[in-house]
């Protein structure tokens, strides 16, 4: 009984820390494009983010129940993910929690893992940002050419951008949060506390990764909205195909797509190369650590 209680308390501490880091890193998914376009103040964006995350946590129980049935090696996977996410956040690089967790679990269960399925997932991780680039390029090119006054009203587009930011933040609370906490609890109170830790991470360190996204290319309110929309559409396409993909990678693809419409030189390739480098390295680190632990046991 004491062993179980200690294990749950340890999972709780690690989970809250991971959510804190998740907030610091993935807040950029929700408000990074709005921040880059100066749609409103960063303080207002953080308030919008926090409200949306906490509301999302109220709808997290179903996902938490599903994750709760798949809790094998959960504590070890959480520790590995916390380490890798901390490193990525320190490097100011947006990283997907799902890619890190999946790779850590592959490493921990290397002997029994279905590598064919992992290959399909890996392919979806590569293709999703590319699809987002294509969608964003097409949509923004079309937007620049159309002459419909209502679609050119910045105030209206700003509202759309803020709504899309709220939706992404809601999904962090309703989906990513229970991915972390659902391995050992489905308590609504714990989910709300977890949401507070997530918001705290965003408030204290979220500007680091958001600034990185804002450096990829210059964004207006309209291009920021199309980048966010394109990333969302790319994720929706792969979700419909049953493939887990990274919202982080898709949104970066969307930003790149709108940047390319203005010319290759408008994209800061050094920033983008650093992001892609860590997209490759971070999951590999998680996989290797998991594999080493697998061999030691």
Curated annotation (Swiss-Prot):
Keywords: Cell membrane, Membrane, Phosphate transport, Transmembrane, Transmembrane helix, Transport. GO terms for molecular function: phosphate transmembrane transporter activity. GO terms for biological process: phosphate ion transmembrane transport. InterPro entries: Phos_transporter. One of its GO terms (cellular component) is plasma membrane. Its main location: membrane. The chain crosses the membrane at residues 2-22, 45-65, 67-87, 99-119, 121-141, 154-174, 180-200, 225-245, 274-294. It is a multi-pass membrane protein. It is found in: Cell membrane. PANTHER family: PHOSPHATE TRANSPORTER. Potential transporter for phosphate. Belongs to the inorganic phosphate transporter (PiT) (TC 2.A.20) family. This is Putative phosphate permease MJ0630.
């Amino acid at each position: 009984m004491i062993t179980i209680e200690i294990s749950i308390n340890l999972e709780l501490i690690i989970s809250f820390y991971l959510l804190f880091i998740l907030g610091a890193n993935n807040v950029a998914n929700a408000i990074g494009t709005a921040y880059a376009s100066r749609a409103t103040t960063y303080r207002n964006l953080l308030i919008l983010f926090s409200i949306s995350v906490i509301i999302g946590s109220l709808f997290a129980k179903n996902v938490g129940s599903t994750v709760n049935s798949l809790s094998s090696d959960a504590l070890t996977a959480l520790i590995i993910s916390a380490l890798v996410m901390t490193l990525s956040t320190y490097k100011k690089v947006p990283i997907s929690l799902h890619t890190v967790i999946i790779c850590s679990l592959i490493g921990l269960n290397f002997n029994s893992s279905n590598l064919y399925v992992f290959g399909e997932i890996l392919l979806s991780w590569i293709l999703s940002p590319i699809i987002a680039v294509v969608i964003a390029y097409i949509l923004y090119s079309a937007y620049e050419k159309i002459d419909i006054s209502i679609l050119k009203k910045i105030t209206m587009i700003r509202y759309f951008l803020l709504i899309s930011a709220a939706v992404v933040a809601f999904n962090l609370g309703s989906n990513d949060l229970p991915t972390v906490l659902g391995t050992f609890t489905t308590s609504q109170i714990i989910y709300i506390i977890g949401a507070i830790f997530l918001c705290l991470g965003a408030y204290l360190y979220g500007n680091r990764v958001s600034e990185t996204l804002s450096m990829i290319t210059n964004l207006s309110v309209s291009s920021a909205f199309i980048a966010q929309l394109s990333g969302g559409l790319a994720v929706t396409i792969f979700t419909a195909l049953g493939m887990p993909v990274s919202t982080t990678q898709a949104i970066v693809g969307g930003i790149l797509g709108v940047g390319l419409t203005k010319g290759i030189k408008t994209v800061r390739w050094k920033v983008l190369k650093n992001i892609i480098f860590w997209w490759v390295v971070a999951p590999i680190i998680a996989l290797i650590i998991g594999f080493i632990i697998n061999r030691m046991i």
